[in-house]
Design a protein with these regions (language model features):
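Conserved beta-strand scaffold positions in the cores of enzyme catalytic domains, especially
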Residues: 34, 52-54, 99-101
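Alpha-helical scaffolding within the catalytic cores
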Residues: 57-64
Length: 119
């Protein structure tokens, strides 16, 4: 049972909730940088989280040198059930970036009517 609890605690530690990210956005936006890692053309995406940067998961490894380690990165994809966010998070963590996956992904953000912008 202890191993299951430890595994679940580790799993949950990889996520950040919407409210924490939104609070930073409403202040000065200097703590977190949100990355949209969806591998889709703009016409398919249509919108994204306000002020997020777009780096498709398939291109993230090649663009790591454009990211500063002064920020905490929050990655998201379409829904919490897809793996792009997890793949991107793994890449960031393997390269010593502080990073989290957004709990609920874009679907959860939209469901709470939080700030979006067109792509």
């Amino acid at each position: 049972m202890k191993k299951k609890i430890e595994l679940l605690e580790t799993y949950l530690s990889l996520y950040i909730n919407h409210h924490e990210v939104l609070e930073d956005m409403e202040k000065d936006g200097n703590k977190y940088k949100v990355i949209d890692v969806r591998n889709a053309p703009k016409k398919v995406k249509k919108d994204k989280i306000k002020n997020s940067i777009e780096i498709p998961a398939k291109e993230l490894k090649e663009q790591l040198d454009t990211l500063s380690k002064d920020y905490i990165y929050v990655v998201y994809d379409w829904t919490g059930g897809t793996i792009l966010g997890k793949v991107a998070l793994l890449e960031l963590l393997k390269n010593d970036f502080e990073a989290y996956e957004l709990a609920g992904a874009l679907e959860g953000w939209k469901g709470m009517n939080l700030p979006l912008e067109e792509v």
